[in-house]
Amino acid sequence: MATWNSRGLRGSALEELINFTNDTYLKNHLALIQKIPTPITPMKIDRETRHITLAYFDKKSTVDYIGVIQGIPVCFDAKETAVDTFPLQNIHAHQISFMSDFEQQKGIAFIILHYTARNEYYYLPYCDIIKFWERSEKGVHSFPTRRSSEIGRASCRERV
């Protein structure tokens, strides 16, 4: 079971960048995008600093962000990897399910992927994420940076 001390819960430069961008969009009346907190149950609290030092997830979260951009509903997750491949185990089944349901309601679901070693960022639309997800069920458990750059060139809606 993941805890508050887990690597995935330390915050990231990517999320800080996204939060700053979302604040700028809000101030300029371009978008309203909210960071979705992961529900937790605190187990240990440092009495001096009043910081949570150990906590457990209450339930599975959906995605990191949900909002609307000029009337278009969006949901997305922020993912980072320090290597030249993105491990699909970093995307969870409940997130795929949520993004699928979101797209069925005419929203746009995607992942913003940051390759930290290269300092490269990619937009991965749900329609491409699901292709990789289905391949992972057949044994292909990651995809390289070069595939990310190919994906970001045209959206799925443009390809249909």
Predicted regions, residues:
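Short connector loops at helix/strand junctions that flank enzyme active sites
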Residues: 58-62, 69-73, 104-106
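Short, small-residue-biased leader/transition segments that mark boundaries at the very start
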Residues: 143-148, 158-160
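Conserved catalytic cores of phosphodiester-cleaving nucleases, focusing on short active-site segments
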Residues: 65-83
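Mg2+/Mn2+-dependent nuclease catalytic core
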Residues: 79-98, 102-105
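Nucleic-acid nuclease catalytic cores
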Residues: 100-130
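Short, solvent-exposed loop/turn segments at secondary-structure junctions
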Residues: 42-43, 82-86, 119
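Acidic-basic catalytic patches of nuclease active cores, encompassing PD-(D/E)XK
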Residues: 1-56
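Short, electropositive alpha-helical surface patch
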Residues: 125-142
